[in-house]
Amino acid sequence: MSKHSTSALTMRDALYEAPGPKTKRKIMVGTAVSAVVVACILLAILGRFYATGQLDPRYWTFFLEWSTWRFLLQGFAGTVRVALTAGAISLVLGMLLMLGRVSKIKPLSAACRVVIDFFRGVPSLLLIYFFFLVVPQYGIKMSSFWMLTLPVALAASGVLAEVFRAGVNAVPRGQVEAAMSIGLSPAKTMRKIVLPQAVRYVIPSLISQLVVVVKDTTVAYVVSYPDLMQNARVLITSYDALVSVYFTIALIYILINYAINKA
């Protein structure tokens, strides 16, 4: 076992002591009680759905038709297009904003800090309304795809810029000094030494932010973009089946986000 792994194991043991028999019994009891409470809540919800007729077959049988799933798959494809495009744009823009934020040029650093704080603070829904209602007033025509994708990407870029900056700050200062001492320029040091390590450090945070991007696409109804949620709203209107459709769509989104986290 390497010295690094031994040190990490020692630190983990110091922070998280293995539970003893008494603690294990408490955990088992707590788990059992929680399971019973959750089961009771689910039964109460199902009972309420049954009492109001939401479990009637007419609200569920249309999911046995291929046309329903084809329509949902079309919306799923729209969601994937927006999520991938917005994710790619936000990664590039977030990296550029981070580089500007850590720049030694003070005006550039200050400007990037303002932009980052703005995009982090403004809700993505407000940005979508801006692109949908305000931007066209200035003669700029956009498709519903870009009216949704750009705001989602901008909102995510502010968060990703800070994620990247945290990764850069996590790189040991000694490595930067060593690179500078052998004659590497600050730009080459950032590109060859700092960024590769910083990106590895923040991969879990990048995945989490991609999940947020997928969730942000659910407001596509604002711009009438045919994503998964928008097509679900059409099904609800067509079949008057709010509970069954939203339940199915929720499961689909859970599977999408689970797949992203496991990627």
What are the functions of these language-model segments?
Residues 2-263:
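Transmembrane alpha-helices and adjacent helix-loop boundaries
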